């Protein structure tokens, strides 16, 4: 009972966040059991199957939800894979790195799947899934580029912020090199501007392992 309540609470929070992002109302599903009927919002039901959605902009709110769900599912079963479904244009680097670090921190393998778009930090998180378990659907688009940023204020403050952006660019390039097998200098060249790829191109590049047309294919 407590487990179901925790799942419901986590998923309701995610469902509320998705609604605030303008993604519409969250549908409900009803399950029959020997104890009667039980209604779940769709994300609660999928969370029971160890499926997490990372949809929309990467920000602190979505990062906190994904991190919480990863930690919860690890506590439920540290040996069973977690699936992370991604449809995101990217967003905050710090929020993305929080999710990346947690994906590496938890014991279960985190399988990633791109549906629609995985751009910027969305593509970074897609590539950060467990090796051999990173997927994209046939018409998905994946885009990598260098981190974006702006600065204002005194010259010394602008210099500090510029150094931080350069550090983040180097760190992200290093991680992408590790997960794709591409040399760091090639990653740096390829992310200098927006670099869009199809699923097959992303597979060839090393961002994903397989393009899935059908489940179990």
UniProtKB/Swiss-Prot annotation:
Subcellular location: Cytoplasm
InterPro entries for the chain: ClpP, ClpP/crotonase-like_dom_sf, ClpP/TepA, ClpP_His_AS, ClpP_Ser_AS
A Pfam family: CLP_protease
Enzyme class: hydrolase
One GO cellular component, as annotated: endopeptidase Clp complex
Reactions performed catalytically: Hydrolysis of proteins to small peptides in the presence of ATP and magnesium. alpha-casein is the usual test substrate. In the absence of ATP, only oligopeptides shorter than five residues are hydrolyzed (such as succinyl-Leu-Tyr-|-NHMec, and Leu-Tyr-Leu-|-Tyr-Trp, in which cleavage of the -Tyr-|-Leu- and -Tyr-|-Trp bonds also occurs)
Origin species: Ralstonia nicotianae (strain ATCC BAA-1114 / GMI1000) (Ralstonia solanacearum)
Active-site residues (renumbered): 120, 145
Keywords, sorted A to Z: Cytoplasm, Hydrolase, Protease, Serine protease
Known role: Cleaves peptides in various proteins in a process that requires ATP hydrolysis. Has a chymotrypsin-like activity. Plays a major role in the degradation of misfolded proteins.
Oligomer and partners: Fourteen ClpP subunits assemble into 2 heptameric rings which stack back to back to give a disk-like structure with a central cavity, resembling the structure of eukaryotic proteasomes.
HAMAP family, per the entry: ClpP
EC number annotated for this UniProt entry: 3.4.21.92
GO biological process: protein quality control for misfolded or incompletely synthesized proteins
Protease among keywords: yes
SUPFAM superfamilies for the chain: ClpP/crotonase
Record-given protein name: ATP-dependent Clp protease proteolytic subunit
């Amino acid at each position: 009972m407590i487990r179901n309540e925790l799942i419901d609470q986590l998923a309701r929070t995610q469902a509320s966040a998705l609604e605030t992002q303008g993604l519409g109302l969250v549908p409900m599903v009803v399950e029959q059991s020997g104890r009667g009927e039980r209604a779940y919002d769709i994300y609660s039901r999928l969370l029971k199957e160890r499926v997490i959605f990372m949809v929309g902009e990467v920000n602190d709110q979505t990062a906190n939800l994904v991190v919480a769900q990863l930690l919860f599912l690890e506590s439920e079963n540290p040996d069973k894979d977690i699936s992370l479904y991604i449809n995101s244009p990217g967003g905050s680097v710090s929020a993305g790195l929080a999710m990346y670090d947690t994906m590496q921190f938890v014991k279960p393998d985190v399988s990633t799947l791109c549906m629609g778009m995985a751009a910027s930090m969305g593509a970074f998180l897609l590539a950060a899934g467990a090796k051999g378990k990173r997927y994209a659907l046939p018409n998905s688009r994946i885009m990598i580029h260098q981190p974006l940023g702006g600065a204002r204020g005194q010259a010394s403050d602008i210099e500090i912020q510029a150094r931080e952006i350069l550090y983040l660019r180097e760190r992200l390039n290093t991680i992408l090199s590790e997960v794709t097998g591409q040399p760091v200098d090639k990653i740096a060249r390829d992310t200098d501007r927006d670099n869009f790829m199809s699923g097959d191109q992303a597979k060839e590049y090393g961002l994903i392992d397989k393009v899935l047309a059908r489940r179990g294919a």
